Amino acid sequence: MLKFVVVICLVIMAITFAEKCGDQECGEGTCCLDYSQQHCSRLGKLYDMCSDPNDKTDSGSHIFFCQCETGLRCDKTSWSCQKG
């Protein structure tokens, strides 16, 4: 039981101290996602799920997926990164 309590406390601490992000804080090749918590995630590679680069929240974060990396586009039919 004590181990369970310790694990729960660690999870709560991790959530409490999680770094908030914006695209300015995320490094090159990443974007800020606002999915349950804000966190940096890598840009979409070929066939990865993606979001339109213009679809952002008021704070500048993406909701579920990052935009595609340079040279790829987000196909709005399949919502996946495709070539050019």
UniProtKB/Swiss-Prot annotation:
It comes from Illawarra wisharti (Illawarra funnel-web spider). Belongs to the MIT-like AcTx family. Its main location: secreted. Transmembrane segments: none annotated. The keyword Secreted applies. Disulfide bonds join C21-C32, C26-C40, C31-C66, C50-C74, C68-C81. It is found in: Secreted. Expressed by the venom gland. The keyword Transcription does not apply. Residues 1-18 form the signal peptide. InterPro entries: Atracotoxin (IPR020202). Keywords: Disulfide bond, Secreted, Signal. GO terms for cellular component: extracellular region. This is U1-hexatoxin-Iw1a.
